[in-house]
Amino acid sequence: MYRIPTLLTVLILLLGASPLRAAPFCDPPVLTAVAIEERTPGFTVDAEYPVLCRAEPSRVIRDFVSNTIFDFKKVDPGHDLSVFPHPYELLTRYAVWPTAEGRFVSVKLHVMAYTGGAHPNNWPMTWVFDMADGGEITLNRLFPDREAALDRVSALCRKVLSASLGGMLVPDMLDAGVRPVEDNFKRFILTGEGVAFFFAPYQVAPYAAGEQVVTIPFDHLGGLIAPNIAAAVRAE
């Protein structure tokens, strides 16, 4: 007697031993972008930021941009060009790096603010979000042994920047900017190559050198990255 295979049996035969892929955490990681434009005789605001596919990270980014705009407007609310003949400006632009399977999404916001002086101030703001729970991957969450990790990261960044800055190298500035303390390395993202650390103008070199970034490959940080994060990154 022959039995008609059930649908489940057919699927098992077709799939064989192939591993089942987990469903993506959310897709696409960026749903849309928000643009804020305001112009008065004394001010220009031109801000953009992403809306991610989870509500928690989107609120964090939105609140940061809103507070930055609020603080910018407080600098000189009555500015009308009568004393200083140039408008004040605030600009933000963003970039997003999802990891291959979407577990982690990194966001970098470039902020430029001009409120007088010889040139604008520029600085990076970064976040790494775990799309499994919407939480932020802080430096402490990335590196359980923060002291050992900062010592390693500091030494590697010093080596790279000492070579790449060339004529812009100012040893005292570099020494201060890469000291193994949390504030010097809190602006980072996760990429396919490793952990990228961003340094604002003046942190490690003169303003003319611009923003600096050092990407440290994951294998150079072996044993220092939190096991659950390292496992997820390796799996991707």
Stretches with model-predicted labels:
Residues 5-16:
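Bacterial N-terminal signal peptides
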Residues 20-236:
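Compositionally biased intrinsically disordered regions enriched in Thr/Gly
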Residues 1-2:
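N-terminal secretory signal peptides that target proteins for export/translocation
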